From Swiss-Prot:
A motif (DDB-boX) lies at residues 73-75. InterPro entries: CUL4-DDB1_E3_ligase_receptor, WD40/YVTN_repeat-like_dom_sf, WD40_repeat_dom_sf, WD40_rpt. The keyword Ribosomal protein does not apply. WD repeats lie at residues 251-289, 293-332, 341-383. It comes from Schizosaccharomyces pombe (strain 972 / ATCC 24843). Pfam families: Beta-prop_DCAF4. It is found in: Cytoplasm; Nucleus. Coiled coil: none annotated. One of its GO terms (biological process) is transcription-coupled nucleotide-excision repair. Its main location: cytoplasm. One of its GO terms (cellular component) is nucleus. This is WD repeat-containing protein 21. The DDB-box is specifically required for ddb1-binding.
Amino acid sequence: MSGLPFHIPGYYYNSEKKRYFRIISSGQSTPSSNIYTKERLKRGKRFNNISKERTKGKGGNPVFNFSTYLFDRQFSQYPYSCNDDRDYLCAKNLKKINLRQLPVGTELQKIGWLREVNTIILTSKNGDILGCCLTPEDKSGVANEKYTSEGSIQDFSLSRIGLSNNPISSLVCNAMQIFWSTSPSLQNEGQFHISTYNQLLGESNNYRWGSLKLLKTPLCAESIGEMGFAVGGTSKIAIINREGKLTQSLQSKGDVFSLKYLGDNLVIAGCRNKSVLVYDLRTKKECVQRFYHGSSICSMQNLDFSQPKLLVSGLESKISLYDCRFLQSKKRPQSIMSYMGHSNLLERNLALMKNENGSIFSSAGDDYVLRFWKTDCSLPFKEMRVDDGKYLCRDGSWVKAMNGTGWVLPYGRGLLIYEP
């Protein structure tokens, strides 16, 4: 290097070793593999040479590499820079609704959507179960609302439909029914609860409940169509029909953190021990298919029922997409797509959502940033910082209301709404 070295924030240049070192908070320095170090340059050069050798044909001419072309094309279309404040334009796209009627100290956590009655179901850390009906504004321009909202044209009608004595561990909704599970306490064991929401009265009826003692600690739940609901917990999965009766118990050999229904009686479970288990509810076996992810699994999302593709998010910096039709041959299969930019190294439950047709999905990170990907692009096309970083977005849902569509996420004492 000729002349003075470049000044890089957070690094200093050692003239004897002719390389950069990273400065850590305690004042010491450690070698860092970045784009300015010799090791990084040598590794990149060696990787490029290996790639060229692999892409050569018999005649010595380079063969067209579709994956390289696809990645370069995706990278060139990525419009944002990680150090640019434009990444976090939340004023125009992300709206925050403060629910003033909620008591001080209330923190919303779970969300579900009742499609038939166009109602959002919310749960709080204190055990509140709230119904939030989406209604359009009157023709006179006066909003028909039971509380005051700030900074949004959306209109909500909020009502409390239940109160749980124990913390609510999971919430799921189908067309008309609400299903939630509660964690065990010193006085009570884990339980499940089922009720039907009455839109006219703004309350729930046909209430049923039961014990989940076999699960020890319920952790997640999923609607499985006409068969009812599936609840995942400590080393087991319980299948409960719509009448509130336990119909089946499945072994998982690991704590189940996420459940997804793929249709055709297939249920997929993501576990703490990095395994993804596929169950066929028509059989009595433990599981019909098993494969392993790169890290402990936190959230999953299915993109399409006709061509079952599964998004898997774990305690790592990427989200993987698997094709469930080609997972039988290998214990550690290769994902068909990896989505970079995700950040989740601390939390178990963070929001992972998709839109109606599965072409766009979103994920919340432990750095208080919402990221949005297109399923055919490995880099996020939009990133938005969530407010001041007080609360993590642990759950979210795609909502198709009468006056618009978008993602809704519970956040503290309010809601975050993003309309693409």
